[in-house]
């Protein structure tokens, strides 16, 4: 795991997600969620099960990390439970780079037909921001005057 500056710092989707309201505490005053992460996996194509690297930002502190091992990224999330990990189009792509299909199948889920809204495993709530912001990242970025980054071909 390495610290990496400005990986996702300017992402409009990530800033918008952090502003989504949630119930912040249980009846006894303890936090329901201690941390909110936004993550993204980069791959050599459309195979989410073989990512090159993953990057995440902790929204409360703006700390950023890059992981070459997705098991390390998952352990990082699990070390901050209870937490929420958001990815844009995560339920159709990114989640499969972090969890295997058996874990996805066996975990607690909030579903709408075949659509996964939330998947919970080991205290981490994996959520898909595409259900809140139903645009591709390229159009979402453009709507707020930004550009979506592209992974260099040399990776």
Predicted regions, residues:
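Detector for Asparagine
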Residues: 6, 10, 19-22, 26, ...
């Amino acid at each position: 795991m390495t610290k990496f500056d400005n990986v996702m710092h300017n992402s409009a989707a990530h800033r918008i997600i952090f502003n989504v309201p949630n119930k912040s505490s249980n009846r006894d005053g303890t936090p329901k969620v201690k941390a909110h992460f936004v993550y993204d996996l980069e791959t050599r194509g459309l195979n989410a099960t073989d990512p090159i690297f993953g990057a995440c930002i902790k929204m409360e502190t703006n700390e950023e990390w890059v992981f070459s091992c997705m098991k390390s990224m998952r352990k990082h999330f699990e070390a901050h439970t209870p937490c929420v990990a958001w990815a844009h189009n995560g339920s159709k792509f990114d989640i499969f780079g972090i969890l295997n299909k058996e874990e996805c199948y066996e975990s607690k889920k909030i579903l709408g037909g075949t659509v996964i809204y939330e998947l919970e495993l080991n205290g981490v709530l994996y959520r898909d921001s595409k259900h809140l912001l139903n645009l591709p990242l390229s159009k979402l970025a453009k709507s707020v005057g930004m550009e979506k980054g592209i992974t260099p071909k040399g990776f």
